[in-house]
From Swiss-Prot:
Residue ranges of every copy of the F-box domain listed in the record: 1-49
Identification of the protein by name: F-box/LRR-repeat protein At3g58980
Superkingdom, taxonomy of origin: Eukaryota
InterPro entries with a match to the protein in the record: F-box-like_dom_sf, F-box_AtFBL13-like, F-box_dom, FBD, FBL60-like, LRR_dom_sf, LRR_FXL15/At3g58940/PEG3-like, LRR_PRU1-like
Residue ranges of LRR repeats: 103-125, 128-151, 152-174, 203-218, 219-242, 249-272, 288-314, 315-339, 344-369, 403-414, 415-437, 450-474, 503-518, 519-541, 584-594
Alphabetical keyword list: Leucine-rich repeat, Repeat
Pfam families: F-box, LRR_2, LRR_At5g56370
Organism (species): Arabidopsis thaliana (Mouse-ear cress)
SMART domains documented for this protein: FBD
Xref: Gene3D superfamilies: 1.20.1280.50, Ribonuclease Inhibitor
Amino acid sequence: MDRISNLPNEIICHIVSFLSAKEAAFASILSKRWRNLFTIVIKLQFDDSVKNEGSLKDFVDGVLALPTSSRVRSCSLECRREFDPTHYDDFNRCICALLKRGILDLKLDICAGRRYSLPLEVFTCKTLVKLELGSDFGGFVVDLVPEDAFLPALETLLLNYIRFKDLRRCAFEKLLSACLVLKELVIHNMEWERWKWSGNISSPTLERLTISHVDLYECEFTRINLDTPNLTYLELSDAVPDDYPIVNLDSLVEVKLDLTLMVDHKYHGYVDDNDTISSNPTNLINGLRNVEIMNLQSPNTFQAFSYFHEAIPVFKNLYHLTITNNDTVIGFCWEFLPFVIKKCPNLKTLVIDGPLHYNEDRPKSVCHCLSGYSFLLSCPLEVLQITDYSGTPGEVEQLKHFLEKLSGLKLVKLHSLTRFGSDKKKLLMLPRASSKCKIKHYDSLENALLPSLKTLILDSVKFYDRCGCCAFQKLLSACPVLVESVMRNLEWEDWEWSGCASSQTLERLTIDHRYWAEHNLESFTFDTPSLTYLDYNAHVPGSYPTVNLDSLVEAKLNLGFTTDLVEDDDDPFTSDPTNLIKGLRNVEILRLWM
């Protein structure tokens, strides 16, 4: 103890930050010097998904045991599996105790039922600088914000699956009004249509705003006001309402848009010319006139700018434009692009995040929607970047138009999963309007390296073999310190890959197949000698040729068997989990699911 006591105060405080609330409380009685130092607790954390974390009651008791003179800077409470009505009172007592101890950063990552009510003291805390409410698993309802709500120090507010339902006055608007210095507001998994609110997002101090809608089925809300005169960053992924009556975005510098037009207030996918569009983004689009950086993040957004092109203002400050073509249908038209480019007199960089647009049936022609690329003739573009360029005849033909019509072009960056070989020389020989234009090609797989990546989460991702090697395995090989990988909503049958998961460093692996498919993998290999945790929910393939799970401690299995796995009528094969089952021989905890 003497050696530790001789350390500087800063180091001792850092050591304390790794203690639980109860341990910190017990340690505070060791000496007078330690008691004084422990009046500041750097961080408290509870996560019911972490093994050996202890119970929520133990954590609450530890917090309540802290001296009343102590100060807690940060606390994260993550209660998803264990958070049920019997814990509501304990949880709220813990929150109130933290609020009395000068909490600066509070994260309440919880999924609670309709009967849960957040302590009203949260809305009158004078010390909170950052507040995070809700969870990806469901969040909770805020049905009352007190009249005396006052959060004078709050700069960052994150809401996840939070719904506001104050019938007397708009609780959401009241909350924003209580935040005198709010700089950043993030609303994830938002459902306007389930809120009871005024439709006003108003803050004179707000600088960054992120909104993402969770489902787009029916949206009956009619209007949203954006009264945020100091906003510099906007990320909006949402269904477009009937109107944006007030749009005050004069300070906006960067915007990312994923807008979906509604047909009769319902999600209709891509809009047809004969559809009755209930959405109107006119004022929103016009309100973007001062932006410098813009990202149109989906073909749905392309449609919004196309159908309402008359609202597109002159983007006098816009110098960097990104269009994200994440649709698998290359033929989806780009009518919006000429309208936008013509309104960008100072555009310097265009990033096409995805493939170029062309008609696959007529690859050497130009789609009518691009008007022969004539809009490029007056464009001052200097840098063109294409993130998914395969060098097909159709893509080469489209690229020619950019090279031949952009007289100020200085650099073309082409990112590809394909090794060009001799085609690269042909690419460099293409004629250009600018003598200063250089073309650089980047082989994404060849240069793949993620030296610091420890956690990799893939959700609904597919891998295709475009360069003669397994893209998925190439990705794993590029992660020399990978510890955890989570793969959700998989569709193995649509992948082009080797059927192998190989990593020498991987410790935790979760695999969750989306559908019980009629056909499945012939084989799957686990080459993961350091793996200690496996959560495996998938169909059993024809075989497991290699299973290296010698370090496995815990396994959760939900295995499906297909009795008619055939590639064709003459080549049947069956599911065989033999080697997988044998490979589990060292596990200590085994859970089998139906």
